[in-house]
């Protein structure tokens, strides 16, 4: 049967023309493709159903397995927990017995210590009673000694009181004379100091105004120089970035041209697609395969050219964006640096004005200190500093050599500050010494009038009073007392 069918088919094809044979072959191929597609769809549907059944069975088996596994684990865990409970109960009983024994021993110790505490308290009370008796006897003896010493001191105090009264009256007269002379002397000194201060103040005002004008002119020149440097930097920046700007403009023009070319290519591709659709219609109506292959090759070439142009366009856009970003960052950095330079110049101007205001007359006359080195030694030091193996370091030292005067002046100010601090410390020590002298003088000499009017004065005695206190006071060494007026005159 198949051979006959083949013969019939061969006979049937033999009676057809070339175009009919091609059409027949195409229809046959389409029928075979449809049959194969139907078989593939049926197989896919069958496999999907089988997969769903397998998934359902897998879920059910997993559920059963988990149930069995949970039961096994529960039994195992129950046995372990029972063993742990027995062990813990035994441990708890053992710990409870141990703590009961400790509590019993602590109760015994507490009773013994309470007994010892009671014994110690009774002995302590006995000792306190003994000490009270001893203290009372000692107080009685001290009271007797105090009364006897008080009688002696009162008689001695009355004699000294009369002597001090007479001496105080004489010293009051002397102090009044000294105070009058000192007030007159200080009033003359105050007037003279005010006149000197006014004249010095006028001179300093005039000198400060002249110095301020000079510094202002100097700082105007510095600001002008900074502005010129800023303009030079800006011009240099514009010259250095001019080529990059031109390159950026060229890239932008190329970008525009590339966009135009892409648009034209898109239109050309659209035309080619239209022609391809027409060729496909012609092909379906019976044209040759050769024309279709040529059209496909032309389409692939055009697609490659379009892709190549797109890559070039993206690369050009990335390069242009990178150049623009770099130029923006450089311009921002240059602007910030110029603003910092201007702010630094303004800050220097303000600091110079403040320094000129705070400058003393001595600093204006002698702004620099004299070096302890000779001229030859200074030249040798400078030559050694300049003789360096590093050329950059040598150039930097040469560039910053004008700052030597500034550092000399700064070091002079630091030395002056140290000298002023040392002088302040010495003056504070001298002030403390004078205060001590004045306090001693007032303690030994000055007595207020109210104290002399009182009938009884408080007497401070040593802790242990003896019968020989009066004789020891007479034998004490008398210190030489110097008046405060004499000390002040010597210091002035």
UniProtKB/Swiss-Prot annotation:
A GO CC annotation recorded here is: motile cilium
**Alphabetized UniProt keyword annotations:** Cell projection, Cilium, Coiled coil, Cytoplasm, Cytoskeleton, Flagellum
Coiled-coil annotation: which residues? 16-95, 256-318, 373-401
Phenotype when the gene is knocked out: Morpholino knockdown of the protein causes strong ciliopathy phenotypes, including pronephric cysts, axis curvature, left-right asymmetry defects and hydrocephalus. Cilia length and number appear normal, but cilia are dyskinetic.
Recorded hits in InterPro entries, A to Z, give: DRC1/2_N, DRC1/DRC2
Location(s) in or outside the cell? Cytoplasm, Cytoskeleton, Flagellum basal body; Cell projection, Cilium, Flagellum; Cytoplasm, Cytoskeleton, Flagellum axoneme
Q: What is one GO biological process annotated to this record? A: cilium-dependent cell motility
* Stated family: Belongs to the DRC2 family.
This chain's function reads:
Component of the nexin-dynein regulatory complex (N-DRC), a key regulator of ciliary/flagellar motility which maintains the alignment and integrity of the distal axoneme and regulates microtubule sliding in motile axonemes. Plays a critical role in the assembly of N-DRC and also stabilizes the assembly of multiple inner dynein arms and radial spokes. Coassembles with DRC1 to form a central scaffold needed for assembly of the N-DRC and its attachment to the outer doublet microtubules.
Q: What is the annotated quaternary arrangement, including any partners? A: Component of the nexin-dynein regulatory complex (N-DRC).
Q: What is this protein called?
A: Dynein regulatory complex subunit 2
Species per Swiss-Prot/TrEMBL record:
Danio rerio (Zebrafish)
- Upper classification of the organism: Eukaryota, Metazoa, Chordata, Craniata, Vertebrata
Q: Which gene encodes it?
A: ccdc65
């Amino acid at each position: 049967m198949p051979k006959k069918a083949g013969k019939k088919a061969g006979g049937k094809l033999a009676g057809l023309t070339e175009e009919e044979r091609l059409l027949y072959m195409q229809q046959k191929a389409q029928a075979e493709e449809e049959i194969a597609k139907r078989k593939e769809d049926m197989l896919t549907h069958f496999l999907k159903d089988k997969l769903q059944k397998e998934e359902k069975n897998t879920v059910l088996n997993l559920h059963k397995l988990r149930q069995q596994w949970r039961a096994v684990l529960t039994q195992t865990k129950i046995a372990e927990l029972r063993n742990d409970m027995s062990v813990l109960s035994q441990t708890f009983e053992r710990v409870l017995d141990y703590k009961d024994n400790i509590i019993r021993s602590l109760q015994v110790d507490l009773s013994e210590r309470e007994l010892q505490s009671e014994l110690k308290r009774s002995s302590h009370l006995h000792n306190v009673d003994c000490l009270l008796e001893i203290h009372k006897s000692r107080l009685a003896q001290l009271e007797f000694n105090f009364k006897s010493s008080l009688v002696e001191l009162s008689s001695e105090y009355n004699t000294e009181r009369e002597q001090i009264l007479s001496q105080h009256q004489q010293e009051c007269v002397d102090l009044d004379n000294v105070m009058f002379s000192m007030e007159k002397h200080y009033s003359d000194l105050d007037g003279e100091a005010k006149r000197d201060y006014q004249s010095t103040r006028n001179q300093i005002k005039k000198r400060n105004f002249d110095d301020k004008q000079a510094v202002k002119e100097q700082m105007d020149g510095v600001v002008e120089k900074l502005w010129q440097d800023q303009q030079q930097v800006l011009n240099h920046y514009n010259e250095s970035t001019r080529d990059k700007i031109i390159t950026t403009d060229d890239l932008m023009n190329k970008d525009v041209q590339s966009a135009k070319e892409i648009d034209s290519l898109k239109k050309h591709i659209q035309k080619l697609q239209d022609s391809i659709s027409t060729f496909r219609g012609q092909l379906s109506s019976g044209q040759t395969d050769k024309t279709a292959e040529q059209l496909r090759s032309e389409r692939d070439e055009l697609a490659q050219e379009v892709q190549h142009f797109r890559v070039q366009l993206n690369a050009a856009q990335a390069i242009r964006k990178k150049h623009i970003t770099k130029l923006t960052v450089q311009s921002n950095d240059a602007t910030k640096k110029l603003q910092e330079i201007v702010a630094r110049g303004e800050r220097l101007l303000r600091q110079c004005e403040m320094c000129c205001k705070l400058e003393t007359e001595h600093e204006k006359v002698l702004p620099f200190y004299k070096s302890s080195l000779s001229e030859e030694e200074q030249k040798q030091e400078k030559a050694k500093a300049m003789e360096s193996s590093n050329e950059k370091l040598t150039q930097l030292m040469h560039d910053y050599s004008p700052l030597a005067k500034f550092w000399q002046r700064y070091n002079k100010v630091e030395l002056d500050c140290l000298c002023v601090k040392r002088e302040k410390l010495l003056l504070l020590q001298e002030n403390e010494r004078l205060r001590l002298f004045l306090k001693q003088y007032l303690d030994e000499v000055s007595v207020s009038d109210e104290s002399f009017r009182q009938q009884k004065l408080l007497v401070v005695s040593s802790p242990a009073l003896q019968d020989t206190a009066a004789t020891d006071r007479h034998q004490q060494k008398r210190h030489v007392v110097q008046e405060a007026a004499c000390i002040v005159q010597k210091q002035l």
